[in-house]
């Protein structure tokens, strides 16, 4: 009689723990030019990176800032500004640590936007100075 409840509980737990980071409630501060869909896509990419590099994909909060056109990118994977785009710096509280990312965004020829994510720092304790 208890077996169905145990199985149902196990299934519910597996479903909850397998949700991507972007499906969870995330606190956003700062400014971004990203649409809600692009913001979600970027967060999914960062969550994949966090999972691969640290074994955890939970993103609690994100602070976003648009960088000036004079910004010199760190190891750019794409020349966003020459493609009509821009750079942003996102600071995430992910998995109990802070990490900063350079986000390049530019218009896509297929419609919408393309982007590239470059880690600027490793994982740092939340109490560490920026």
Q: Predicted regions: what is each one?
A:
Residues 1-8:
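Bacterial N-terminal signal peptides that target proteins for export
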Residues 4, 15, 86:
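Functionally constrained cores in energy, signaling, and assembly domains
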Residues 13-21:
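C-terminal segment of classical bacterial N-terminal signal peptides
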